[in-house]
């Protein structure tokens, strides 16, 4: 049985391990900073998915999702942003990402958010398919960028 809950500081090593399994880069400083800014903070969300068997944790962590509420950027009303979502490869396709996404959306809605956004690379078909399957579509903003070199 997969259960979602808010992250606690003890989850940090498992988050670092899962991220490094998927990205092949061990980003210890990045995740320490992210935990400090998101875990237990109002308007910020770090949710964990665990595989539970009879109340005991069978596998410490099978996925996580991170997001926050942002307000008034370029005239935007306060809205939720999903910043990252990861699910262990052997657990993908089992609805865990959907469960995490639904949990973060519920938490944001409980905090009076009416819109949830995310940003993905155009060629990231896996995440594009996932977020579209959750009902997300192109929004009213366009990302612009330039090199500062």
Language-model regions, residue ranges each:
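Conserved active-site alpha-helix within GNAT-family acetyltransferase domains
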Residues: 98, 122-140
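Hydrophobic adenine-recognition pocket in adenosine-nucleotide-binding enzymes
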Residues: 7, 85-87, 120
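Conserved GNAT acetyl-CoA-binding A-motif
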Residues: 108-120
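Acetyl-CoA-dependent GNAT
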Residues: 2, 6-10, 17-77, 83, ...
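Short hydrophobic/aromatic beta-strand or adjacent loop that forms the aromatic wall/cage
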Residues: 43-44, 139-143
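Conserved acetyl-CoA-binding loop-helix of GNAT-fold acetyltransferases
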Residues: 87, 93-106, 133
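Alpha-helical elements of Rossmann-like donor-binding domains used by nucleotide-donor carbohydrate transfer enzymes
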Residues: 14-18, 33-34, 99, 103, ...
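Solvent-exposed, non-membrane alpha-helical residues enriched in polar/charged side chains
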Residues: 35-36, 105, 128
